[in-house]
Amino acid sequence: MISPNRQGIVVWLTSLKYARQLRRFGHVQYVSKKMKYVVFYCDQSKVPELVDKLSSFHFVTDVKPSMRPFINTEYEGAKPDKAKEYDYKLGI
């Protein structure tokens, strides 16, 4: 079962042969062969400890947690575009 409070972590590696080792820390979502990074998800409560732990590995060059859970996605007072509103009324 997927936890509702999960957060993404991006880990840049020196070599992709270590990408499989990251599976024990969370759910690996994407591995970039060209840019040598791994995107995986884990519980939001474990993120600070995982960032410290992953940074200590010799094969990790950089670790960045995702800020998406902290960004407000509900916009108040957004003005609709008049041209699109007119097109919707015409049925285009």
From Swiss-Prot:
- An example Pfam family from this entry, by short name, is DUF2129
Q: Which UniProt keywords apply?
A: Cytoplasm
Source taxon at top rank: Bacteria
Location within or outside the cell: Cytoplasm
Q: Which InterPro entries match?
A: DUF2129 (IPR016979)
Q: Which GO terms describe its cellular component?
A: cytoplasm
Primary localization = cytoplasm
Looking up HAMAP family in the UniProt record yields:
UPF0298
- Which family, according to UniProt? Belongs to the UPF0298 family.
What is this protein's name? UPF0298 protein ABC2380
Instruction: Recite the lineage of the species.
Output: Bacteria, Bacillati, Bacillota, Bacilli, Bacillales
